[in-house]
Amino acid sequence: KADYYVDLHCGDGFEGLVSYVYCTGAAAPEVAAKSREMAEIAHVDYLVTSMYGTGGAYNYAGSMGIPSILLERGHSSRWCEDLVAEDVHDVKNILRHLGVLRGKSHMHGKPPVEVSPVIYEDAPVSGCWYPAKQPGETFKEGEVLGRICDYFGRELFVYRAKMGGIILYQTISLCIMKD
């Protein structure tokens, strides 16, 4: 039995990302509220409330009544001492906030900015991915976010922003497969 769940991620090998946190939203109101509290203690700039009850251990935990978050920090399945130290600091701070560890928790300036709605795009074709934006960069509705080309440079598909927002994570490998 778990009272709380904190999942630590660093992006898959093909993903670039800016540090952010997911909290579970598809849960009982008190579980979702405690998950959000945990997320707001994290020292990241952005927060996403996931409205899925499945698709990840933290979502499943939330659906089972366990307040949970997923911290994304790092990229490309890489790590460094500074990022590990930030995760350790966040986990200890969250545990202090929850009363699991002694001591006083603290906020890091302002709470993370809620990113909502979130659009997850899949590749409609396989090819070579040429992003126009990097994780952490903002964009306006209609802006080109990236292109998929064939091996000879012929454009197969152009991604345009459906609304203004920020790139939290994206594929950073040249090869992209149709989803």
What does each of the following model-derived ranges do?
Residues 1-179:
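Structured catalytic-domain cores with a bias toward divalent-metal coordination
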